[in-house]
Amino acid sequence: MPTNTLADWFSAPLGAYLLEKERAYLDDETPDIFGFHALQLGLPQYDLLRENRITHRMKIDVGGAVDVRARLNELPIATQSIDLALLPHALEFAEEPHALLREIDRVMMPEGRIVILGFNPWSLWGMR
């Protein structure tokens, strides 16, 4: 399911319910993650780091209303420069999930935090 389809699904009742649960989780878990630079990879139409206190936040995706347009496995970000990375369902739709994880590892600060949202692949929602 491409991310456009996922965004459409989040507009439907069941998807909106899940999106609200994910937002509530992120609002509770990310406010006190300290740092200077945060990025959200994918779903740029949603501000999923809205409660985080990091002032320099970037939304990166291949298109849409983003701060940086880039392939997610080729980020134009300096090595070891990101304090918080959010991947909202990015691994499910990545052409090369391992390449994406390697790229995230490259840009993360040594004590940086990575938050991954995804469907349980063994649940009914995770089935394709």
Question: At which residue positions do the language-model features occur?
Answer:
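Class I SAM-dependent methyltransferase Rossmann-like catalytic core
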Residues: M1-P31
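Class I SAM-dependent methyltransferase SAM/SAH-binding core
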Residues: A24, D28-A78
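Short glycine-/acidic-enriched loop or helix-start segments at secondary-structure transitions
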Residues: L49-R50, E96-P97, W125-G126
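Hydrophobic beta-strand segment of the Class I
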Residues: A85-L86
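A short His-aromatic
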Residues: H89-E96, V107
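A short glycine-rich, Lys/Arg-flanked "PGG" loop and its adjoining helix->strand segment in the class I
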Residues: H98-R113
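Conserved class I S-adenosyl-L-methionine
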Residues: R113-R128
